[in-house]
């Protein structure tokens, strides 16, 4: 394993680009070769190792996009997941999210960005959003076009607010795409 870890540190990025650039054509071959840093373990793990460490109640392969595992840990959305015993994969390369979009799933488990607004959502959230409707509307009006919506969430533990993404393109993917030539600002 030590030899493969060294190999992956040198050529892992090319494996991920191979997965993405081939539009997932070689995903059956490449999916077991790519690795990501585990926030919990602080080392590279394969997708198989990550899924094998799942608890019975875990439905998703959770990931956060940041340059380091510590940066993923610092995201408000990660605190509750880690406290509940879930691991989070650190996607530190620009291509990581694009590559897993080509995979779609791994062993019937979907990939889920921890910044996705649905992570940690509960039926209790809907009730609280209805109860606090006037306050949330006032906050949205005060913030204007800076946010698309304001809502209550039980997904956070010790942080009062967070940014989340909605839809297929995450905040990090938007940054990568906006940095490309001919990107509209």
Tell me the role of every PLM-derived stretch.
Residues 1-185:
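Conserved GHKL (Bergerat-fold) ATPase module
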